[in-house]
Amino acid sequence: ETQVIYPKDIGLIIMLADIFPGAKVVEAGFGSGALTLGLLRSTGNSGSVTSYELRKNQATKALNNISPFMKDMHNLTIKYGDIYEQLDETNVDRLVLDVPEPWNVVPHATRMLLPGGIFLSFLPTVLQVHKLVNELTQTCFQLIETAETLLRPWHVTQKSMRPTHRMVAHTGFITTARLCSPRPR
């Protein structure tokens, strides 16, 4: 089974990746479909989302999760395959990854993203982030940043205010990088 990406992370992913109406987005790790739904809504009717998934049964579950919220999915393409080996898209605005080894996608990303395109990866551990950032720095990616979202709700009444007893803290790290053109020699 897959882990659902929380709304707090989906919102930050959409903002940090600058997902805009009309964007051409490639996603890997279709998962539950929660992030895909956010990407589809953000790209709008004029954009497109291509999602890679290894398992057809998982993609079917994700589509079943998405369909009650979005009947028209004309701008969603699902490709079955290993993103580490197969990435044939070009002129992509944004690449959004929820896979365990995103550093293996970096060489493909440099060929598929447009100059100025954004690479984003969602990872659970800091060791994975470290390995990814080391790989990104060896290429034409710049403005490499990593963040996490901690959501702390508050209990507010007429007579008191305090944080609630439960907090959705660490769920993952979000790393972004922007593809730059190589310097002329």
Regions found by a protein language model. Give the residues of each.
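Conserved SAM-binding loop of SAM-dependent methyltransferases across substrates and taxa
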Residues: 32-45, 110-111
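S-adenosyl-L-methionine
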Residues: 52-103
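Conserved S-adenosyl-L-methionine
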Residues: 22, 41-48, 115
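Conserved class I S-adenosyl-L-methionine
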Residues: 20-31
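SAM/dcSAM-binding transferase cores
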Residues: 134-185
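Conserved SAM/SAH-binding loop
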Residues: 6, 31-32
